[in-house]
Each structure stands twice: as C-alpha cells, then as structure tokens.
C-alpha cells in the first residue's frame, strides 16, 4: 500500500458532497424524495466533491454548492481545482472564482485537454482564464493519476482520479456509462480486479441510480450510469482484502439516501457503504 518516493502534497481527502450534479432537493421536483429533503434539512445533500488537505488545499469538482463545501474545510484558501469532466454540475462553481465573488489570482485548474478546449470555447469560463482568476496546469502529478473512462464523450472526455498515498490509494469514479465499456477500456474482467491492479484500498464509486426504474418523467437510458444493483451483483459480498467501496453521486431519487430503506440495508449487509458528507480518508 505504501507509495514510496511520491511528492506528497496531500495527506487527507474529505468528502464534501455525495449527490448527483444538482444536489438534493432538486429544482422542480415534487416527489417524496425532494419534499422530504425540503422539510428535513438532514436529508438534503450537496453535489459530489472532494477536499484535498495537506501542504496545499485543493478541491475536486467545482459545484453549485462550492461556498458551503469550502466552509466544511474551514474556508481554507484554494490552490487548485481538479475536474473529472465538464458536465455542468461539476464545473458551474467555477464562476465563484470570478470578479463577482472571490476574484482569485491564478488558482490552478487541472483538467484534460478536451476539457481545456471546452472551457475556452465558452465565453463565461474563458474570461476566468483571460482575467487570471484561473490558470491551466498539468492534469497529473506524482500523487494524482487521471484514468480515462467512458461517459457521454461527445464534447469532452471523462476521467476517474487515483490519489496515491503512504496509507491509502483512493480511487474517485463518480461518473461512467457502463461496466462493460469501462472494464473493456481499462483491460479487466471485473471491477475488483481493476481496483486491485490500482492498489486502491478505498473506492468512491458511481452510485447514481439504484435501479433502472427511478426516473419517472425521463428516459433513464439517456442518462447512462451502472446501477448500484448491477454493481453489487458484480462485486458480491465484501471479502477480506477487498477495498472499501463507498457509493457517491447519488441521484435525488436514489433510495440509498434513506438509511432505513431496504436497499440501504441490503448494501450495508453486503459490506459496502454509502458516502456521507464529512467522511475523511487518510492518504
């Protein structure tokens, strides 16, 4: 597990949000899931994001809840931002670095080349670069390894991020389309073999939907994600030597938001976990 020789900038990861891009409750949703969250703030959730602590402070994803998420970290000054991809829910918080808010100076923006191109094609985001609020930086380091995964790649690509440390390697994979495509791309037959090849002891994994029947007013196949139900069939019960697998990026409809649901209990009994805001992971 130890990663000797790594230039260690970060020594801890904090989970700053666990929901899908729009959070919970969602605008316009009148279903029980969001009405419950409006009535009971303990059921509200911020979009998925990570705080990176150590010699510097960084974040992964810039969500609409950026201000509240940074407050969870003591309102620390941000040195860099890592992006997995450029769907709106993962980048809309970038505007907070502009003149209307922080007016930051040369905060590093670490993203893939196709995301760089996407940012520079949009006047709002491009201004953040031209005004010096953000500056592009390398999309890898001794401690952070991007791994490309398939996820609706018409405009830009998507990556998982592997954070390497002396105590744990943490894989962050909040979005991908299907296990078949992802495993084919990375060259493994099942998720656990892939995680083992990365020496990942903690996996923060796409848990968007529990099953294929959650979206009542949309065609769910147009929002591709492996369901949790499918994923745990591939994983089976957790065995000695398996990594901690923690499901994040939960859609507002996902029954895993309720700790007393049958689905939550099934997952828990198999040895897997649901992410909670404020969880900390030592690197």
What does each model-identified segment do?
Residues 55-110:
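Active-site metal-binding motif and surrounding structural segment of the metallo-beta-lactamase
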Residues 169, 177-278:
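Cap/insert and terminal regions of metallo-dependent hydrolase folds
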Residues 20, 88, 116, 210, ...:
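Residue-level marker for beta-strand->alpha-helix junctions and adjacent short loops that shape enzyme
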Residues 113-125:
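A short, active-site helix/loop in glycosyltransferases that binds the activated sugar's phosphate group
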Residues 5-73, 136-190, 195-196, 279-283:
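Core dinuclear metal-dependent hydrolase active-site scaffold
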Residues 58-60, 82, 170-172, 203, ...:
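Residue-level marker for buried hydrophobic side chains located in beta-strands
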Residues 76-78, 101-105, 125-137:
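A short alpha->loop->secondary-structure connector
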Residues 107-116, 204, 246-248:
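Short internal beta-strands
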């Amino acid at each position: 597990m130890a990663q000797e020789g790594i230039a260690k900038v970060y020594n801890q990861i904090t989970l700053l949000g666990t929901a899908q891009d729009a959070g919970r409750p969602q605008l316009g949703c009148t279903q029980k899931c969001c009405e419950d969250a409006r009535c009971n703030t303990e059921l509200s959730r911020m979009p998925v994001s990570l705080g990176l602590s150590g010699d510097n402070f960084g974040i992964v994803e810039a969500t609409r809840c950026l201000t509240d998420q940074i407050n969870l970290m003591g309102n620390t000054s941000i040195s860099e931002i890592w992006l997995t991809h450029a769907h709106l829910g993962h980048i809309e918080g970038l505007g907070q670095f502009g003149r209307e808010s922080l007016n930051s100076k040369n905060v590093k923006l670490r993203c893939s080349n196709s995301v760089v191109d996407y940012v520079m094609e949009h006047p709002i985001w491009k201004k953040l670069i031209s005004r010096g609020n953000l500056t592009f930086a390398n999309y890898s380091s001794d401690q952070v390894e991007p791994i490309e995964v398939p996820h609706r790649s018409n405009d830009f690509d998507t990556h998982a991020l592997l954070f390497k440390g002396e105590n744990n390697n943490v894989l962050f994979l909040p979005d991908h389309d299907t296990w078949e495509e992802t495993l084919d791309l990375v060259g493994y037959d099942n998720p656990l073999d892939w995680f083992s090849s990365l020496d990942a002891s903690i996996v923060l994994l796409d848990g968007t939907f529990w099953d294929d029947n959650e979206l009542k007013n949309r065609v769910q196949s147009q929002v591709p994600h492996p369901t949790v139900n499918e994923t745990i069939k591939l994983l089976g019960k957790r065995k000695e030597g398996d990594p901690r697998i923690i499901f994040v990026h939960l859609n507002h409809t996902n029954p895993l938001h309720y700790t007393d649901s049958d689905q939550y209990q099934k997952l828990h009994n198999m040895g897997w976990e649901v992410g909670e805001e404020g969880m900390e992971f030592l690197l």
